[in-house]
Every structure is written in C-alpha cells, then in structure tokens.
C-alpha cells in the first residue's frame, strides 16, 4: 500500500512539474476576455502660449563677382602630349589592413571564423523536456526502491 502511495505522489509531482515547465499558456482556465474601452469625456486642449516675433536677421551679402580665368587653348591633335596631359587622374589610395606582427595570430574582420561557435549549455533540450525527464526519473527511482 505504501508503494502505491509513493507512486501516486511521484506521478502528481510529474504532472505538476510538466505544468510548471509549460508555463501559463497551458492552463485549463480560459483567457479573460478583453473589456470594451470606457468612453472618457473630451478634455479641453491646453492653452497655447503667445508666439514672439522672429528676431531680425542681418541681410545676406553676396561676394563681388570674380573675373573669369583666361581660357586655355585646346591642344592640337598633331602636338605631342604634355606631361600634364599624360598625368593620371588623382585616385584615392587603396588602404590595405596592417600586416600582423611576426608570431601573432590574427584574423581580419571580413573573414568568417574557421571553427564553429561552441554549443550553448541548453542546446537542443527545452526546459520543459528536461523537467519531464527529471520527473520520470524520480518516479522510476521511487518505484525501484519499493
């Protein structure tokens, strides 16, 4: 008779642990219905403070016109190209990442990590599943001793 009582208590603990692990969404009571909003009386808008006139701004002066530069004659097709004409256009230099110091292990930020991240402590096992397994283990242990 005592063995049956212990098994019943262990089964009750199993169901309680499963209900706690599943959270409040698994409760047998229905969710409360939303109440319709209560109509509130209209309120008066707040008083508007008088607006001061904008401060006077100084007049904008334009700089005097600058005389146009003298036109540069276009080079003829038969003329040899001058050193200025053959100079390449200025391009911004391409910056490369600094070289790592000798003996150091470095990884550029654009490269992907070479090894996968370590698994987390609870990877693949939900808390509710862990609680159910622990409760079943407790039931099995109690039943084995009696």
Swiss-Prot record:
Q: Where is the composition biased (Low complexity)?
A: 75-89
Write out the entry's keywords from A to Z: Glycoprotein, GPI-anchor, Hydroxylation, Lipoprotein, Membrane, Proteoglycan, Signal, Vacuole
Q: Lipid attachment points, GPI-anchor amidated serine kind?
A: 120
Q: Which residues form the propeptide?
A: 121-146
Q: Which GO terms describe its cellular component?
A: aleurone grain membrane; side of membrane; vacuole
The yes or no answer to whether the keyword Signal is present is yes
Location in the cell reads: Vacuole, Aleurone grain membrane
Q: Which residues form the signal peptide?
A: 1-42
Modification(s) after translation: O-glycosylated on hydroxyprolines; noncontiguous hydroxylproline residues are glycosylated with arabinogalactan.
Q: Where is this region: Disordered?
A: 21-128
Q: Where is the composition biased (Pro residues)?
A: 27-74, 90-101
Where does tissue-level expression of this protein occur? Expressed in roots, stems, leaves, flowers and seeds.
Topology with regard to the membrane?
Answer: Lipid-anchor; GPI-anchor
Name the family.
Belongs to the classical AGP family.
Q: What is the annotated role of this protein in its UniProt record?
A: Proteoglycan that seems to be implicated in diverse developmental roles such as differentiation, cell-cell recognition, embryogenesis and programmed cell death.
Q: What protein name does the entry list?
A: Arabinogalactan protein 1
Which organism was this protein described from?
Oryza sativa subsp. japonica (Rice)
